[in-house]
């Protein structure tokens, strides 16, 4: 139980390193120390107790020792050290794009200290007998590790607040914008679809613009990926790190998202269930539409998460609100029927996905026609819903027809939106993430199991893509080395707006034609803090 208490005390600063914005006062820190220590004593200590009891059946000596055995203590603290080491290094690896570099470095230091502690204990347990005052020495050694881990957390620099404008900055955007996000699409799926003739509009526009793959957020989390796309900032800066957030009222008033991964189910690493579910977080930096609205443009948004607000907003339709599959074009339904009959267990889900996508597209086109806007941002999840279930393992399968019809629907919606916005509109089509089969390592885990059908998924953060076409874009250009955060920075530059210094993205100059690059300077502002009234703080129309 004492070993478990030390484990809880050592894991607490690792969890705090995952929460850079949490800086509790001393009293709350003491409460946190007691909470995690008692949690570790019960759960980790209870596990170690069961392990020691089981081991005593094999090694009777362990059960015959009276009092506090220093030798047994060392052998119990070795797995504690291994758990702390693994937790520090694993969470550092699993927060590549989600955590500030200083905090990830703190996890690396913590893992190294725990590894050194474990190796030292292993050497002592094997090669040395307990000396005089061995108990005091053992407890002091473990206390030193806990102290060092808390010192690592205390010495980690706090995050910098967003730079504020001294006065309102005045900018005048140029042109119109159509910003389309197709989740779950990528070039390996898109290019063949265009070659087959499934996407004639996009194929026609392809040579008029610049395109390339996008490195997405790693590890994959949809919430962080979308927020990175529309803010141009890293997740650690815009603050949206995952789908689920929690409130820990006895520690901080701020919602927290990242939880320490380890051999325990989430969210039970938060002690004693003293937490509450929190609603989804909104980005702490202004989104693309907020920046545009702050300059005076009318912006429509459709299909984005709940934090999206524009001059008008089309939310993601619910199943009950959609017109239904029966209301779709008869020729479209007739082309789908053979494929749907081949997989009746998936047919209802596919019909629902098509109906929702069609409802979102038609509602958005109607809004643009009746309430014209200067910019439109729309997000569609159709491909992300259908590809994992309908991707065919063999060419020529009837399953392919479902995805072909999905490509045709997306292309037709894109054409309708582009015509509604006007031909002189800057067109941006982007996929924040792609889909790919499981990696060889994931397949190896299931080696020897029952035969299974592998599904494509975004788990390994496959690359997405970006396509830009319109005023200021260099035609017939292949982009290389582009990242997801680069999209918003490039769009702002093409619309004659400044780029924020705290954005992780850069302007994709290869996508800009020479005339614009020579005539339009790259302007920078400190930041675009989110204004909860709907705009970007410190930016106004000229």
What kind of feature is each model-predicted range?
Residues 142-173, 350-371, 376, 386-437:
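A long, amphipathic alpha-helix that forms part
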Residues 211, 445-497, 512:
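Substrate-binding rim/cap in mid-to-C-terminal beta-strand-loop elements of soluble/periplasmic
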Residues 170-191, 205-206, 229, 292, ...:
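Beta-strand elements within well-structured catalytic alpha/beta cores of enzymes
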Residues 44-68, 73-100, 104-120, 174-175, ...:
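Active-site-proximal alpha/beta segments of enzymes that process anionic O-linked groups
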Residues 109-143:
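Cytosolic-side transmembrane helix boundary signature
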Residues 436-441, 479-486, 494-529:
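Polar, surface-exposed loop/tail segments
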Residues 163-168, 430-469, 521-522:
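Histidine-centered active-site microenvironments of extracellular/periplasmic hydrolases
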Residues 10-27, 86-101, 125-128:
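Juxtamembrane "helix-exit" motif on the non-cytosolic side of transmembrane helices
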């Amino acid at each position: 139980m004492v070993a478990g208490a030390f484990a809880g005390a050592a894991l607490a600063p690792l969890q705090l390193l995952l929460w850079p914005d949490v800086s509790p006062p001393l009293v709350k820190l003491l409460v946190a120390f007691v909470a995690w220590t008692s949690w570790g004593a019960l759960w980790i200590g209870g596990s170690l107790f069961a392990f020691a009891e089981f081991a005593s059946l094999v090694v009777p000596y362990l059960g015959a020792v009276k009092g506090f055995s220093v030798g047994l203590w060392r052998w119990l603290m070795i797995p504690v050290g291994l758990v702390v080491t693994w937790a520090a290094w694993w969470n550092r690896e699993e927060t590549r794009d989600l955590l500030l570099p200083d905090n990830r470095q703190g996890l690396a230091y913590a893992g190294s200290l725990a590894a050194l502690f474990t190796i030292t204990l292993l050497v002592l347990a094997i090669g040395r007998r307990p000396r005089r005052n061995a108990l005091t020495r053992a407890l002091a050694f473990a206390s030193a590790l806990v102290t060092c881990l808390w010192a690592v957390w205390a010495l980690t620099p706090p995050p910098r607040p967003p730079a504020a404008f001294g006065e309102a900055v005045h900018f005048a955007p140029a042109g119109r914008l159509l910003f389309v996000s197709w989740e779950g699409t990528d070039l390996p799926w898109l290019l063949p679809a265009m070659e087959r003739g499934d996407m004639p509009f996009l194929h026609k526009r392809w040579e008029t613009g610049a395109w390339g793959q996008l490195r997405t957020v790693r590890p994959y989390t949809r919430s962080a990926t979308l927020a990175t796309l529309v803010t141009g900032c890293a997740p650690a800066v815009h603050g949206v790190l995952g789908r689920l957030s929690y409130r820990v009222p006895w520690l901080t008033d701020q919602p927290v998202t990242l939880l320490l991964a380890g051999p325990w189910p989430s969210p039970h690493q938060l002690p004693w269930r003293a937490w509450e579910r929190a609603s989804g977080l909104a980005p702490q930096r202004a989104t693309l539409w907020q920046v545009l609205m702050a300059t005076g443009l009318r912006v429509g948004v459709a299909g984005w998460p709940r934090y999206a607000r524009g001059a008008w907003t089309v939310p993601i339709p619910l199943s009950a609100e959609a017109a239904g599959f029966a209301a779709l074009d008869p020729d479209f339904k007739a082309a789908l029927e053979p494929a749907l009959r081949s997989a009746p267990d998936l047919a209802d889900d596919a019909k629902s996905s098509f109906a929702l996508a069609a409802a979102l597209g038609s509602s958005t086109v109607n809004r643009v026609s009746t309430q014209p806007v200067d910019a439109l941002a729309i997000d569609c999840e159709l491909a992300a819903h259908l590809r994992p279930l309908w991707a065919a393992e063999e060419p020529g399968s009837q399953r392919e027809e479902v995805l072909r019809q999905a490509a045709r629907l997306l292309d037709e919606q894109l054409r309708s939106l582009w015509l509604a916005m006007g031909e002189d509109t800057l067109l941006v089509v982007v996929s924040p993430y792609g889909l790919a089969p499981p990696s060889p390592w994931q397949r190896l885990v299931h080696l020897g199991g029952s035969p299974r059908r592998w599904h494509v998924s975004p788990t390994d953060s496959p690359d997405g893509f970006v396509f830009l076409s319109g005023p200021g874009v260099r035609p017939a250009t292949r982009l290389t080395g582009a990242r997801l955060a680069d999209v918003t920075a490039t769009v702002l530059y093409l619309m004659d707006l400044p780029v924020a210094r705290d954005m992780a993205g850069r302007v994709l100059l290869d996508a800009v034609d020479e005339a614009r690059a020579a005539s339009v300077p790259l302007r920078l502002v400190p930041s675009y803090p989110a204004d909860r009234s709907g705009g970007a703080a410190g930016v106004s129309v000229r």
